[in-house]
Amino acid sequence: MASAELQGKYQKLAQEYSKLRAQNQVLKKGVVDEQASSAALKEQLKMKDQSLRKLQQEMDSLTFRNLQLAKRVELLQDELALSEPRGKKNKKSGESSSQLSQEQKSVFDEDLQKKIEENERLHIQFFEADEHHRHVEAELRSRLATLETEAAQHQAVIDGLTRKYMETIEKLQSDKAKLEVKSQTLEKEAKECRLRTEECQLQLKNLHEDLSGRLEESLSIINEKVPFNDTKCHLYNALNVPLHNRRHQLKMRDIAGQALAFVQDLVPALLNFHTYTEQRIQIFPVDSAIDTISPLNQKFSQYLHENASYVRPLEEGMLHLFESITEDTVTVLETTVKLKMFSDHLTSYVRFLRKILPYQLKSLEEECESSLCTPALRARNLELSQDMKTMTAVFEKLQTYVTLLALPSTEPDGLLRTNYTSVLTNVGAALHGFHDVMKDISKHYSQKASIEHEIPTATQKLVTTNDCILSSAVTLTNGAGKIASFFGNNVDYFIASLSYGPKTASGFISPLSAECMLQYKKKAAAYMKSLRTPLAESVPYGEAVANRRVLLSSTESREGLAQQVQQSLEKISKLEQEKEHWMLEAQLAKIKLEKENQRIADRLRGTTSAQLPGLAQENATVPIASSQEEAAAKVLTEPVQSTSLVGMLTRTPDSEAPDVESREDLIKSHYMARIAELTSQLQLADSKSVHFYAECRALSKRLALAEKSKETLTEEMRLASQNISRLQDELMTTKRSYEDQLSMMSDHLCSMNETLSKQREEIDTLKMASKGNSKKTRNR
């Protein structure tokens, strides 16, 4: 895998290198083209300069010509000024000469005028040529500057690409060396993998044999134990009992319960809407208590009076449908027989709406023809008539689709199963349309009611009736919106659970087969129930519940424990208050006891010694009298308790007036001591809170600084790791280059050693030859 990754990286780098080479060639070509275009522009600039010089020369010649013409004009004007007085003197004598002078003057004037026009034209041409030259020169200079900058940029890009190419080449060479090393290791791994594949093939063969045996066994079990599956007559397959899906049944019952609740909200709103509409007809535009209403409105009121017989069955039909969906049944379109009843009730209500629609439209037209109807009210009535038509059409559409939904439970061949997706989608669209039209009715009726309230003859009864109709319309709007959103949220679930038959089938199962299937399901459930034997209880239910509670209490969360601590603190504070109360009561009771003992002692001292015979009787009656007095005093002095945040206080009636001062002093001292104690505790708590707040602020600052330092350290660590990896790569490349250089140097040294040894041998041979020659010469 590592070699494959490196090979892929190498191929990517080679592709990038080829792309960069192609880009480099394109950039070089662009630079050459730009240089050629800049040279052409320079040539054009030279040509423009030459044309400018020519134009300047022409301008100079024209200015010179203009000066000559101006001088000539001055001379002609002077001659004309001299000729005018002469003409006056010789006016009588020389009429012929004056005519000649006039002709010459006219000729001169025409010549002068032509010269002036020519001069003006030349000035204009010169100015236009000068402006055009300046404009062209500026454009060429700007284009030259842009081309120079682009050429510099292209050159910089080329330099950068060449540097990048060199770096890429070096990196590719190093990667190639790594890949060669890894390829050798991968070859070894490939050999090991071949051995492993041979072992795996043997294991696969054994597993295949084992699984084929298991498959044959499973197929035999399926053929014996699977429900009846007739491939020739599919009608028999409808008698198979499907798997019981309790979750599906519970969800269907929940959905039916929600639908029942929505219908129960809609039915009273519809009843109120029709009833208050009937009441309004009796009031406006003609009050039936004062005058007779029109026959049309009488008939309309009679029909509206029957609305309950059409509206209430809708709720009853939905209730029967809800009761038919239980946990033991299979709820699909073939088994929901009660949906047909709801569809019939909805059809009767739609007929009722069709019956009252013409009367409602005519009643609104009659209101428009009334003298009390203003143009604004007439416009609102027209909008309401259109809304009523739309509402009836929406209910007709909804009734059509609900009837189609009830078909599978009565006529399964009426419509294919694939078409019911669009049927359910259209039901949702019809419900949304009902919501929209009810919003329009509420809006338009609100505007109509506000206009009618401004009529001077509007009675309080009319205002109240309009408010009731408007509130019922708003209720209908809210209910329709809830039903539309509810159906839109569950339409996918309805589509997924249309039938209990095979999913590949195109039609529905007949209602008779569905009924038989439900009977078989009940029989199968009864049979399974008879087979089930009750299990012996391992742990009593009460003990299991107690253990579960203990387990849950032992695994409470932090919030639960905090709540328990808070409750414990509250209990402790209440107990402290009760403790203070009873301490105060004990002190008061002690004072009462001392007073009572003193009173009894005073009474005993008042007895005289002359009453000795009745002493025993008196001693016997004193405790009884004292006990009676105490009981009476206790009854008369029934304490009244009052509680507060500090403690509880017991108040007694004014019969103990002598003890009030001492009691008040005692209570005052007690509360002063308590207030001083609470004040000291409050000050201590405030100082602790200030200290804790300062510590928290310091800790938060330290935390922020620590987070910042952590971020900086992580960034530094990342940079350091990058530097380390870069330095390691550089070290590897330099090491490899040094090793290559050393190998080259060692080869070079070997070759040099060989050449040196050869040269030494040649030198030795030459020395030997020279020695032999010298000996020969000496011998000679």
Curated annotation (Swiss-Prot):
What tissues contain this protein?
Answer: Expressed at 16 dpc in the cortex (at protein level).
Residues forming coiled coils? 1-209, 556-605, 694-742
A molecular function (GO) held by this record is: RNA binding
Region Disordered, as annotated, extends over 84-104
Query: What does the UniProt entry say about where the protein is found?
Result: Early endosome
Low complexity bias (residue ranges): 95-104
In terms of one coarse class, where is the protein primarily found? other
Q: Which GO CC terms are listed, alphabetically? A: early endosome
Q: Identify residues that carry Phosphothreonine.
A: 652
Q: Which InterPro entries match?
A: PPP1R21, PPP1R21_C, PPP1R21_N, PPP1R21_six_helix
- Spell out the disulfide connections: none
Q: Which UniProt keywords apply?
A: Coiled coil, Endosome, Phosphoprotein, RNA-binding
> What is the purpose of this protein?
Component of the FERRY complex (Five-subunit Endosomal Rab5 and RNA/ribosome intermediary). The FERRY complex directly interacts with mRNAs and RAB5A, and functions as a RAB5A effector involved in the localization and the distribution of specific mRNAs most likely by mediating their endosomal transport. The complex recruits mRNAs and ribosomes to early endosomes through direct mRNA-interaction. In the complex, PPP1R21 serves as a binding hub connecting all five complex subunits and mediating the binding to mRNA and early endosomes via RAB5A.
**Could you give the domain comment from the record?**
Coiled-coil domains of PPP1R21 are essential for RNA binding.
Q: How does it assemble?
A: Component of the FERRY complex, composed of five subunits: TBCK, PPP1R21, FERRY3, CRYZL1 and GATAD1, with a ratio of 1:2:1:2:4 respectively. PPP1R21 serves as a binding hub connecting all five complex subunits to mediate the binding to specific mitochondrial mRNAs. Interacts with the GTP-bound form of RAB5A (via its C-terminal region); linking the mRNP complex onto trafficking endosomes for active mRNA transport. Interacts with PPP1CA.
**Annotated protein name in UniProt:** Protein phosphatase 1 regulatory subunit 21
- What would be the name of the gene that encodes this protein? Ppp1r21
